[in-house]
Swiss-Prot record:
Pfam families: OSCP
The gene coding this protein: atpH
Lyase in keyword set: no
UniProt-recorded name of the protein: ATP synthase subunit delta
Transmembrane region(s): none
Alphabetized InterPro entries for the sequence: ATP_synth_OSCP/delta_N_sf (IPR026015), ATPase_OSCP/dsu (IPR000711)
Gene Ontology MF annotations: proton-transporting ATP synthase activity, rotational mechanism
Location in or out of the cell: Cell inner membrane
Length: 184
């Protein structure tokens, strides 16, 4: 099984368990919080991701962590499953996949908008309304900054990429000039 399918399968299983008790958002908050703790703490991350550390020690650590921060049984059991199957290293990917599935279950599309500079709230609202009108769907927009695009924006969702950046336009011109054998 490829890694993408594996990640999605874990995310689907977690979401399905959360749906039984209608606590999908709570589970997302918990799993995101746990992921942040692991990501931000080098020692915890190395301990849980290390193939050398005994699984029983990892299980004890997860149980202790769950007790200290009071997470749900669903999340605790999910983390224990990841430990038992040696899959803790893909937790961040699973959290991202869970988030995507959660929004899909609410019929909300996640869209990433990349700009060269921080956009003002009015600009963000305008972009959001234009994207929602184009997609005819409610969206959750993730605004990111990448100053290498020089100006404009790049819009990403699903497998779509709409490049309205200056860098993208320059790349297209460069490619067109190469096709007609003009040195760039």
């Amino acid at each position: 099984m490829n890694k993408g399918n594996l990640i999605k399968n874990y995310a689907v299983a977690l979401l399905n368990n959360a749906m039984v008790d209608n606590i999908q958002d709570k589970i997302f908050e918990e799993i995101t919080s746990i992921n942040r703790i692991i990501t931000d703490n080098f020692d915890i991350r190395e301990f849980l991701f290390s193939p050398i550390v005994n699984k029983n020690d990892k299980i004890n650590a997860v149980n202790s962590l769950a007790k200290n921060i009071k997470i749900s049984t669903i999340v605790q059991n999910f983390l224990l499953l990841l430990v038992k199957n040696s899959r803790t290293a893909i937790l961040s990917n699973i959290v991202d996949a869970y988030n995507t599935l959660l929004y899909e279950s609410k019929n909300i599309k996640i869209v990433q908008v990349i700009s060269a500079n921080k956009l003002q709230p009015k600009e963000q609202e305008w972009i959001k309304s234009r994207i929602e009108k184009e997609l005819n769907q409610t969206t959750e927009i993730l605004f990111d900054i990448d100053n290498t695009i020089i100006g404009g924006i790049i819009i990403k969702y699903d497998s779509m990429l709409q490049d309205y950046s200056i860098k993208g336009s320059l790349e297209k011109i460069k490619k067109a000039l190469k096709i007609v054998n003009i040195a760039v």
